[in-house]
From Swiss-Prot:
Superkingdom to which the source organism belongs: Eukaryota
Gene that encodes it: rps8
Subunit structure: Part of the 30S ribosomal subunit.
GO BP: any one term: translation
Name of the protein in its database record: Small ribosomal subunit protein uS8c
Sample GO molecular function, one term: structural constituent of ribosome
Organism: Helianthus annuus
Amino acid sequence: MSSDTIADIITSIRNADMYRKSVVRVASTNISQSIVKILLREGFIENVRKHRENNKDFLVLTLRHRRNRKRPYRNLLNLKRISRPGLRIYSNYQRIPRILGGMGVVILSTSRGIMTDREARLERIGGEILCYIW
């Protein structure tokens, strides 16, 4: 675990998806809970439950996989960390990038909490671009 909890979440999910693991365990923080809610709402993960072990809270995520055995396995999730502790990236609502022409999701940290690019455009607020998911 590093000091960048968002990068830890993204790396854990990406590694589990790459090795076809169906369950991922990530540390439970306010930021991770907000990001996981967005992933669940957008359909990138199937299920979330809270788990407590040795006085530490964890989120147990069930990933969504393609179940086609005829073709080679391809990753379903593509996640990329954008703003990081060494280089923060901010955007106003007009310049929030569209991922795959609107098919992907941009997660932003705004003054009203963590939200997707669509929600930020509707509320006309910008913020720090945390990550891309497609």
